[in-house]
Amino acid sequence: MKTVLIHGKDDLRIEEVPTPEPGPGQVRLKMAYAGICGSDLHYYFEGANGAFVVREPLCPGHEVSGTVDADPSGRLVPGTPVTVHPATFGECLPGLEGHRHLWPRGAYLGSASTWPHTQGGMSEYLIVEAGMVRPLPEGLSLADAALAEPLAVGLHGIAVAGGVAGKRVLVSGSGPIGLLAAAGALASGAAEVTCTDVLPGPLERARALGVQHTLRVGADELPAESYDVVLECSGVPAAINACIAAVRRAGVIAQIGMTSAGPKPVDLATL
């Protein structure tokens, strides 16, 4: 089968590798779509995603969809359209029974965080644990289903923030994650949603989603102490500082965007 492999910084190759066979408890998927996450770009342009350095050829891709190709258990019918929960979980620690995503030694598709690396879905076929497979509801296309994982990021941020129903919500950074978080906030009953970005294009897309207000960073003023919930999706220190000033007293900031490695100048005095 053909697969995309990142060998290091600026070194991406399409190679032929043996088609894998599913073992007990596994399913083989025929891939249809794979989104390109920011982490995938870091692996390509930098040879690393933060502290996770590419040490062997890495197939990226965790925002995926496809169809069932082979299920040795017979539970899933070949051709069934699916997406994938891209994580497997490590060992539970006391007090973390209900928080599997915090368990140490977990793994993630298309990640150099483990050794050997956990290969991702930018290939013709992918082997996953059966429990990672999510059959699609009727009417959801494979193309749209590839957005399930980034949508889940935004929805998780909303859940961590305690929900947004009836609340004034600020989304900082209107890239794909920010826009999906905004869509999730609208669908979850937010009273109003405001999106910010440094570029006009993302703000146009936010308005197309139904967002009530958009603010251009550097051109429009962000009102102070005005939002019940802030979903910070950029990871930019200046934006984090702006969000601290914008959230109301006793409001909530959910930090969804990832910062780059190293200390960051975030002013906590306002809190």
Stretches found by the model and what they are:
Residues 5-21, 38-65, 83-86, 103-117:
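N-terminal glycine-rich cofactor-binding segment
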Residues 20-34, 48-96, 137-139:
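Glycine-rich beta-strand-centered segment in the early N-terminal region that forms part
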Residues 25, 222-230:
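A short acidic, Gly/Pro-enriched loop at the edge of an enzyme's catalytic core
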Residues 79, 137-219:
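Mid-domain Rossmann-like dinucleotide-binding core that forms the NAD(H)/NADP(H) cofactor-binding site
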Residues 81, 168, 251-253:
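Short glycine-centered segments of the SAM/dcSAM-binding site in methyltransferase folds
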Residues 90-172:
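NAD(P)H dinucleotide-binding glycine-rich loop of Rossmann-like/cofactor-binding domains
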Residues 237-271:
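Glycine-rich phosphate-binding loop and adjacent beta-alpha segment
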